[in-house]
């Protein structure tokens, strides 16, 4: 994957997240600034998703901790093979919201 494809794939993830939050009518603010997507919950807690261009990775930080994801076999996964979406659903739950991607 080249850098342009990387940015396109991450932006698709961010778009999916925004659309799902809107579809579910969740009270979560979504802000995207440069390489960082911030999801802010009612209690002011946050999930941060950011691009790590140098490594072509997607990083997720939440109350669960921090995780790194590489794009392999058409999906974002950790080194252990766990999907980004599974981690994100758990992070939402830890922040008090139920969502399914």
Curated annotation (Swiss-Prot):
It comes from the Bacteria. GO terms for molecular function: ferric iron binding. Keywords: Iron, Metal-binding. The keyword Iron applies. SUPFAM superfamilies: Frataxin/Nqo15-like. One of its GO terms (biological process) is iron-sulfur cluster assembly. InterPro entries: CyaY, Frataxin/CyaY, Frataxin/CyaY_sf, Frataxin_CS. One of its GO terms (cellular component) is cytoplasm. Involved in iron-sulfur (Fe-S) cluster assembly. May act as a regulator of Fe-S biogenesis. Belongs to the frataxin family. This is Iron-sulfur cluster assembly protein CyaY. It comes from Actinobacillus pleuropneumoniae serotype 7 (strain AP76).
